[in-house]
C-alpha cells in the first residue's frame, strides 16, 4: 500500500509543478493517469520513485514513512520499484533474454550477470517471464530488431524478474500503434491481477485509461482533480482535467 499526503513540488523561482497531491494506492490496482502536457505527470512519477525530491508532503510505503529516505535506504526501496519510460532502458545489441536477465542485477552478484554466468534456474525464470508477455519466440532476438511494443514488453518482463512490487509506467505506449499499445496495456493489467503489483500508468489516450484503469486519475495544474473507479469519464470530468 502507498499513502501520499499533500505532496507538493516546485521549481525555482516560483513554478509550482505539484500542489498538495494526496491518495492511497493498493496492491493489484492499475492507476491510469491522464492530463495535459505540463500537468505534472512525469514529475509526480519521479517523486514517487524517489528520483526527485519534493518540497513538502508525507510518503508512506508499506506502513513506513519514507519521506526522508536517504542513501542505502533509498536503494533498498528502489529494489521494489520499476520505472518504464517511452523509450525502454534496454541494451539494443543484447537479446531479449539477456535484457530480462539484467533485471536480476539488484538481487544477484553483478559479475555473474555481466559475465553471462547466470544459472539455469535464472534462465528458466527469464523465459517464463518472456512467455508471460507473449515473447517467448523472441527470446534470442537482439532487442534492436524488435518493434517498439515488443521492446516495451521486454522491459515489463525485466521489471517482473527483479520482483517489482510497484511499476511506474511513464507514457509506455506513446508512439505505438493501437494494437501494439493494447498488448502492452493488456500485459500491465494482467500483472496487476495475477501478481498484485501496483501499476501507475500515465497515458495520453483517455480511451485507454477508461478501458484499462481500475482507477483513473486526472491531473491539472499539478493538482489531482479527478480520482474515480475505472469507467468512462464524464464531460465535466474531462473539462476539469483538460
Where are these regions (language model features)?
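Conserved ABC ATPase signature
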Residues: 142-146, 150
Amino acid at each position: 500500500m502507498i499513502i501520499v499526503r499533500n505532496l507538493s513540488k516546485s521549481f525555482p523561482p516560483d513554478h509550482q509543478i505539484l500542489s498538495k497531491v494526496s491518495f492511497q494506492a493498493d496492491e493489484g490496482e492499475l492507476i491510469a493517469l491522464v492530463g495535459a502536457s505540463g500537468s505534472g505527470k512525469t514529475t509526480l512519477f519521479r517523486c514517487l520513485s524517489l528520483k526527485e525530491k519534493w518540497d513538502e508532503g508525507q510518503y508512506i510505503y508499506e506502513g513506513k514513512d519514507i519521506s526522508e529516505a536517504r542513501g542505502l535506504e533509498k536503494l533498498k526501496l528502489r529494489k521494489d520499484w520499476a520505472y518504464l519510460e517511452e523509450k525502454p532502458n534496454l541494451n539494443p545489441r543484447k537479446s531479449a533474454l539477456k535484457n530480462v536477465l539484467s533485471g536480476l542485477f539488484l538481487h544477484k552478484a553483478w559479475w555473474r550477470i555481466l559475465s553471462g554466468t547466470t544459472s539455469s534456474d535464472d534462465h528458466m525464470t527469464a523465459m517464463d517471464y518472456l512467455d508471460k508477455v507473449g515473447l517467448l519466440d523472441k527470446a534470442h532476438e537482439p532487442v534492436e530488431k524488435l518493434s517498439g511494443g515488443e521492446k516495451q514488453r521486454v522491459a515489463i518482463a525485466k521489471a517482473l524478474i527483479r520482483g517489482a512490487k510497484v511499476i511506474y509506467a511513464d507514457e509506455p505506449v506513446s508512439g505505438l500503434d493501437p494494437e501494439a499499445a493494447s498488448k502492452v496495456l493488456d500485459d500491465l493489467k494482467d500483472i496487476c491481477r495475477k501478481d498484485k503489483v501496483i501499476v501507475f500508468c500515465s497515458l495520453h489516450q483517455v480511451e485507454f485509461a477508461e478501458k484499462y484503469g481500475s482507477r483513473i486519475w486526472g491531473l491539472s495544474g499539478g493538482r489531482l482533480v479527478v480520482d474515480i473507479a475505472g469507467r468512462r469519464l464524464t464531460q465535466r470530468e474531462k473539462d476539469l482535467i483538460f
